[in-house]
């Protein structure tokens, strides 16, 4: 009697890569393979890599090396897989290498080295929504691949290609399956969410298709309207500041999607933004932020910035600090510029020293922590909707509409027993305390 083959799996990198991992795992289970969390008893190991910055490349190479040492039979996929020579130079014994979102190629290689079982005992166990690596109450929904921008600090287009939007009906069908399975929050991701469908012809964008018996158009605003009809939280990530983003704010004000906008602005100095090949009209950005908040006062704005970009002067950096003070963003991430092999910025003149990067990073964070603390303090005394993420002997932890999982803060809920609530439930919490990242409250 043949035994069911075991496949070990390692997933690294961002939420977009996690979605790719979920797709591969779903294919593996559908084909009858058993997924295990260890190398020891695996017939083969798949490593889904990240290659965005040098530290991610190093982490991926170390994971590949560990899998080879512990098991010996390894297939590599993901963003770093687009640089096959770099992997082969360090790990020549890797069996096969594919680039990102190469699901069919990965499965072809798996079948080559570990033939699919004749009898599939898992077919009936694969859920309609597929295998998910997130908790049952939230899921990432990827609406497109690739990116048409050529930011000088980034090599993603060279690994994931140009923008390729999924058909709107396909996206909505997946969203409905997730909602029907019990998912309470959808996190919309892509390399450039606001560019959804812009890679398609005007004819295709304006073409009427049908979903749930209703005629719809193929564009971001329609997509968000339809996602909002599912009756669950819908959160937008990686939103490039196109003009039509303004049209999303009324949907947030109406409660159709969460009042949360993740816009990676990267800097505030026009000179630095030009060198990055990013939009440079920072005054216009401030005007838009003011208008957005007038339309939707509950709007949470998250952004990310890079300090120490080549050529960044003290004057440029001060412009960034001044922007933080004026914009009063709610959630902010900051990265020190990291040279990436293949990125234009890596070869630019006037590289900033590591000491200066570190010093500017800490100054940046001091300013933003003060701003974030003040904005969270304004929530004390208010009652917020909170989705429960964790319940254990130490208490209950959830997130408000202003908090995305893993990257934002949390809400610690007191005076509530684990018998009274369950993970994924949305409850009302009265906020009693705040710091620069998190909130505390009671029911």
From Swiss-Prot:
Which molecular-function annotations from GO does this UniProt entry contain? 4 iron, 4 sulfur cluster binding; aspartic acid methylthiotransferase activity; metal ion binding; protein methylthiotransferase activity
Name any GO cellular component annotation. Answer: cytosol
Binding of [4Fe-4S] cluster 1 occurs at 14, 50, 79
Q: How is the cofactor bound?
A: Binds 2 [4Fe-4S] clusters. One cluster is coordinated with 3 cysteines and an exchangeable S-adenosyl-L-methionine.
**All copies of domain Radical SAM core, residue ranges:** 133-374
Under Pfam families, the record lists:
Radical_SAM, TRAM_2, UPF0004
Binding annotation for [4Fe-4S] cluster 2: 147, 151, 154
Coiled-coil spans in chain: none
User: Which cofactors does this protein require?
Assistant: [4Fe-4S] cluster
Q: Which Gene3D superfamilies match?
A: Methylthiotransferase, N-terminal domain (3.40.50.12160), Nucleic acid-binding proteins (2.40.50.140), tm_1862 like domain (3.80.30.20)
**What SUPFAM superfamilies does the database record attribute to this sequence?**
Radical SAM enzymes (SSF102114)
Alphabetic keyword roster: 4Fe-4S, Cytoplasm, Iron, Iron-sulfur, Metal-binding, S-adenosyl-L-methionine, Transferase
Q: Name one GO biological process term.
A: tRNA modification
Listed EC numbers: 2.8.4.4
Q: What does this protein do?
A: Catalyzes the methylthiolation of an aspartic acid residue of ribosomal protein uS12.
User: What does the sequence similarity comment in the record state about its family?
Assistant: Belongs to the methylthiotransferase family. RimO subfamily.
- Name-wise, this protein is Ribosomal protein uS12 methylthiotransferase RimO
Question: Lineage of the native species?
Answer: Bacteria, Pseudomonadati, Pseudomonadota, Gammaproteobacteria, Pasteurellales
């Amino acid at each position: 009697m043949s035994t069911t083959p075991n496949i070990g799996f390692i997933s690294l990198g961002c939420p977009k890569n996690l979605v790719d991992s979920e797709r591969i795992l779903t294919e593996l289970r559908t084909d009858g393979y058993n997924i295990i969390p260890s190398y020891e008893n695996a017939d083969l190991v798949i490593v889904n890599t990240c290659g965005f910055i040098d530290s991610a490349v190093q982490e991926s190479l170390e994971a590949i090396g560990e899998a080879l040492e512990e098991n010996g039979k390894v297939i590599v996929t993901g963003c770093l897989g687009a640089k096959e020579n770099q992997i082969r130079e360090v790990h020549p014994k890797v069996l096969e290498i594919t680039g990102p979102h190469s699901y069919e190629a990965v499965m072809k290689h798996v079948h080559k080295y570990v033939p699919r079982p004749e009898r599939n005992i898992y077919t009936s166990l694969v859920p309609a929504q597929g295998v998910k690596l997130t908790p049952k109450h939230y899921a990432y929904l990827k609406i497109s691949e690739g990116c048409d921008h050529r930011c000088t600090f980034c090599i993603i287009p060279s690994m994931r290609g140009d923008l390729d939007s999924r058909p709107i009906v396909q996206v909505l069908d997946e969203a409905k399956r997730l909602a029907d399975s019990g998912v309470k929050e959808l996190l919309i991701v892509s390399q450039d969410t606001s560019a959804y469908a812009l890679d398609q012809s005007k004819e295709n964008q304006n073409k009427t298709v049908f979903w749930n018996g209703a005629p719809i158009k193929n564009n971001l605003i329609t997509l968000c309207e339809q996602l909002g009809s599912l009756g669950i939280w819908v959160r937008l990530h990686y939103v490039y500041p196109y003009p039509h983003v303004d049209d999303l704010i009324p949907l947030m004000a109406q409660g159709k999607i969460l009042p949360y906008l993740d816009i990676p602005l990267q800097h505030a100095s026009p000179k630095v933004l030009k060198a990055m090949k990013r939009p440079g009209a920072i005054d216009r950005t401030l005007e838009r932020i003011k208008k957005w908040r007038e339309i939707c006062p509950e709007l949470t704005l998250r952004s990310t910035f890079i300090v120490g970009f080549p050529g960044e002067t003290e004057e440029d950096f001060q412009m960034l600090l001044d922007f933080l003070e004026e914009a009063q963003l709610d959630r902010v991430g900051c990265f020190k510029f990291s040279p990436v092999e293949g990125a234009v910025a890596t070869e630019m003149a006037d590289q900033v020293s590591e000491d200066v990067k570190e010093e500017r990073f800490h100054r940046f964070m001091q300013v933003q922590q003060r701003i974030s603390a003040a904005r969270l303090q304004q929530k004390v005394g208010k009652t917020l909707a909170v989705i429960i993420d964790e319940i254990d002997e130490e208490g209950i932890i959830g997130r408000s509409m202003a908090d995305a999982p893993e990257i934002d803060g949390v809400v610690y809920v007191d005076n509530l027993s684990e018998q009274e609530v369950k993970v994924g439930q949305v409850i009302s919490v009265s906020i009693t305390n705040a710091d620069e990242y998190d909130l505390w409250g009671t029911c």
